[in-house]
């Protein structure tokens, strides 16, 4: 499909040159401009809610997500949210959309639906969209979307077991505990000369490494700083996965306090060059 793209709401490297204190979510203007000019051609807006994963674990303001939803209503286009990485408690709520009170037209789910034990994906939609394809067979309105591994029983069993855990334990409460510990650790790491930005939401945290803290100059692609830290982590029995110049944590909801202490203690030693 043809698509239109707008700049990422990236607060640390704001394309409008603003900082968090003076931000009024002006970056929504670029989205509205595209919608104004092309609303008749646009079927939907697709977005990762609150956390841009592969882009560098970029956490953006709740107001931006809410603004996107309001624009989708204003210009009568569907809103599709990709909760593959953010769903099932990763941001501190069951789904990231809840932080902004957003009700999307489509929600894409995977990963956490089975706690990662088996592959499974799901697409949720509204009653209105469902009814658009619901009619007598001879009306030819059916959306034929089946595929070979639909409703794989083993994956579905894993999903049911995973969802049952949310009903029976305190996973979301534990996410808040993890976030406090993660935030405290990241605040300490922010003092390092090569850490330009730290950000977190729920059980996800990230540090953006820079060559120059004042100018925000990034390390060059060939310097492989993230890879060096990853290798040092392995030597200390800790997996610190880099995304370019970003080192991030994607912690399980069941992580215990003593495990957090161990993880952050090892990470501090590795990042401090110990």
Pin down the residues of each PLM region.
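Conserved N-terminal phosphate-binding loop of PLP-dependent enzymes in the Aspartate aminotransferase
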Residues: 1-274
């Amino acid at each position: 499909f043809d698509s239109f793209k707008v700049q990422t709401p990236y607060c640390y490297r704001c394309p409008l040159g603003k900082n968090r204190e003076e931000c009024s979510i002006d970056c929504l203007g670029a989205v509205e401009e595209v919608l104004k000019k092309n609303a008749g051609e646009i079927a939907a807006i697709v977005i990762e809610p609150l956390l841009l994963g592969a882009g560098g674990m970029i956490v953006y303001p709740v107001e931006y997500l809410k603004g996107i939803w309001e624009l989708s209503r204003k210009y009568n286009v569907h809103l599709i949210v990709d909760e593959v990485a953010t769903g099932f408690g990763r941001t501190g709520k069951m789904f990231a959309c809840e932080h902004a009170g957003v009700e999307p037209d489509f929600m894409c789910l995977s990963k956490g639906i089975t706690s990662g034990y088996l592959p499974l994906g799901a697409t949720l939609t509204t009653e209105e969209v469902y009814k658009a394809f619901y009619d007598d067979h001879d009306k030819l309105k059916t959306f034929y979307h089946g595929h070979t591994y639909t409703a794989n029983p083993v994956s579905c069993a894993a999903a049911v077991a995973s969802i049952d855990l949310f009903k029976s334990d305190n996973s979301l409460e534990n996410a808040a505990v993890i976030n406090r510990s993660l935030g405290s650790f990241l605040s300490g790491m922010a003092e390092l000369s090569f850490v330009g930005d730290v950000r977190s939401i729920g059980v996800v945290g990230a540090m953006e490494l820079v060559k120059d803290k004042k100018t925000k100059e990034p390390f060059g692609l060939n310097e492989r700083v993230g890879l060096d830290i990853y290798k040092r982590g392995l030597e200390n029995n800790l997996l610190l996965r880099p995304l370019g110049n970003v080192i991030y944590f994607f912690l399980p909801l069941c992580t215990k306090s003593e495990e957090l202490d161990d993880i952050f203690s090892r990470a501090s030693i590795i990042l401090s060059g110990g």
